[in-house]
């Protein structure tokens, strides 16, 4: 039986993943900083206050927050060996992620019909790069969650693999926290 514990008793996979999350923090910090530097500097519209739909995006944000709760419930169930609930909550987490992505696609399409493209103005460029990068990360997370769900359905995921689920949960929670920052900076602070 192999162990992943390092010299300090910490799981090396988890430590490596925290290092990865640190690099992801730098990526999103640079994208958010770029958005803030260019905020309000677009010479032509549409401008954020003309097209951002805060109630719609608030619902999407709530959806993503509920997916974090579902992820906690999935991990807890798997750690307890309750695979029926573990499978259910993994699927719910992925489904909520897909709903969030559907909202992003709808929003991007809506903005495009209102004349906001990637090259329309500085707002469009920074908005689409920031939220698109986040959406790509959510897509990776949903794919990871669905992979874990399929493994669970096939009986290849159980309490012995709980660390794998925990690491996926770290990623998922990170993506959620990043969205809270994006939502606050882009949508709420005008």
Where are these regions (language model features)?
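...captures the hydrophobic TM-helix bundle architecture rather than a specific catalytic motif
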Residues: 1-190
